[in-house]
Amino acid sequence: MKKKVLIVILILLISPLYAQDGIRWMSMNEALEAQTEAPKKILMDVYTSWCGPCKLLDKNTFGNKDVIKYVNKNYYPVKFNAEGTESVTYQDFTYTNPNYQEGRKGRNSQHLLAHALKITGYPTIVFFKENGDLIQPVVGYKTPEQIEIFLKMIANDDYLKLTTGEAWQEYQNNFKGSFK
């Protein structure tokens, strides 16, 4: 028992040191499994291989030390290729990409999970509750400063109080970001 406690303490002490190494991406299946052990919201980066803004989001935003630290602490981060072949079991259904064409250059067919989530542009960041239910997709490239409000609003459940456009506007006006 003491050995397990010591291991957990060491992991907690050492893990912030690795935050600078990058976001600890996982698959959607891994994130959903992790939620059963330790519930946490999921942040899904939906991208395609040909998407220029997706590459910028990866480099500039998900490479930012403040974003890395916050995402690793508050979310299970998922990387999901919207035109890939990964099989994902979500809410009792297994999603695939049956029309994927091996060796095709550029665009390919959309994965059925991306279709089910109504993803229409890339990149899209999709947020899920601790139980796996969809919260909200956020479409388009976001800088660290632009994504901060979404990361914190959703992690802190503030989005539950924002039921009108006016409430969202007031929230934005009062939000004081700290990401650089």
Ranges and model annotations:
Residues 4-15:
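Sec-dependent N-terminal signal peptides
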Residues 77, 113, 121-138:
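A short, hydrophobic beta-strand/beta-hairpin element that forms part of a small beta-sheet core
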Residues 23-42, 71:
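A short beta-strand-turn-helix
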Residues 55-59, 128:
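Detector for the c-type heme attachment site
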Residues 41, 96-103, 111-126:
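Structural micro-motif
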Residues 22-25, 64-105:
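Thiol-based oxidoreductase modules, predominantly thioredoxin-like and allied folds used
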Residues 38-55, 77:
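Short active-site neighborhood of thiol/selenol oxidoreductases, capturing the structured segment around
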Residues 20-24, 36, 118, 129, ...:
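Non-globular targeting/processing and membrane-anchoring segments
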